Every structure is written in C-alpha cells, then in structure tokens.
A protein has these predicted regions:
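Generic alpha-helix signal with a bias toward terminal, lower-confidence helices
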Residues: 17, 45-47, 79-81, 87, ...
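His/Asp/Glu-enriched, well-ordered alpha-helical/loop segment
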Residues: 59-62, 66, 106-178
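Short, acidic/turn-prone active-site loops that include or flank metal/cofactor-
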Residues: 36-37, 94-99, 122-124
C-alpha cells in the first residue's frame, strides 16, 4: 500500500495551499500533479506568479524524485531541463490529451533529456495497450517522422511504468519470471 498527494494542477493551487501541503507532508510522500496540460496552464502561472508552471512548482518545492508530473504538453526546453534536474517523473496520457484537444508533448525531447517517462491514461481509458498504440502514433504525428517512437514508447510502458510503480510500492512489480 502506498500513498501520494494528488494536487490536481498549478492553476487550482494557491501558494498557501502548496505551503500547507509541503508542511503536511511529514512522511515525505510523493506528489502527482497535472503540469502544463493546456496552454492556459502556462498563461495562468505567468499572469499570477510571473513564472512558467514547472518553475513555479520547483520554487514551491513540489518537484523531485517522488513527483509524477502528468502531461507536460506545453513545457519549453528550460522546463524540460528543470524536470530532468529534479529527477521528476513525467507521465504521458495520449488519449486524454487528444480527447481534451490540448496538444501533444514533445516526448522525444524529454526522452533525449533523460527524463523518466511513463505512459498513463488520466482516467480516459483503462486499456494500456490502446494507450500504447495511440502514443506510438502520436509521437510520429508530432515529430513528422514515421520511424520515431518504436523504442521510446515500449520503454515507457513496459519498463518505466513498472519501475515507477515499484518505487512507490517498494517492491519489484510487472515482471513475469520463474
């Protein structure tokens, strides 16, 4: 059994709420939060706090090796670097992103930066193989290159998902062995 703080998204969290959560997190649980899912997330953060979403969450002490950042569609190169620097995990939710018409993240840039990327659904579906298929098509569509994603997407689903789950469950999961 494991727990995390579910924070929803930057645009729903005041500085006071983030401070309260940090102070309440005496057990050093992880956080999961939607990050830059829509372009409006970045606009909101810049207008209210003068910072892009990832930088705001960094300054508020939310990013780190026990944080799962969902989506990260509208992050720029500096934000990708900050996610890597803090060892924050990113979960790509391709069907949810398409269904909400919010865009597609630059999975290849994040992968090349060395970010721990996993594949999720954000509750849009329960079929991870369908998410795999959609993610594979979407990375090709976004990059304009039909030969992309063949290594990255399987790694996200079959390796990184189980490693991230194992990190929080404190157990090896997702491997069939003798």
């Amino acid at each position: 059994l494991a727990a995390m703080f579910g924070l929803h998204a930057s645009f729903t969290l005041s500085p006071e709420t983030l401070a309260y959560v940090r102070e309440a997190n005496t057990d050093k649980l992880g956080y999961h939060i939607h990050v830059a899912e829509g372009a409006s997330d970045e606009t909101d953060s810049i207008e209210k706090y003068g910072l892009r979403t990832v930088e705001r969450l960094y300054q508020e002490g939310i990013l780190g090796p026990n944080t799962i950042a969902g989506h990260c569609i509208h992050v720029d190169a500096a934000e990708i670097n900050r996610l890597k620097e803090t060892d924050t995990m990113v979960v790509h939710n391709p069907e949810s992103n398409m269904g909400n018409a919010v865009g597609a993240p630059d999975i290849l840039a994040m992968y090349k930066a060395g970010i721990r990327l996993a594949l999720g659904t954000d509750g849009y579906t329960s079929d991870m193989l369908e998410s795999y298929k959609v993610a594979n098509c979407l990375v090709k569509h976004r990059s304009g290159l039909p030969n992309q994603g063949w290594g990255e997407i399987p790694t996200m689903l079959f390796e990184n998902n189980r490693r991230i789950a194992g990190q929080f469950l404190k157990a090896e999961v997702g491997i069939i062995k003798e």
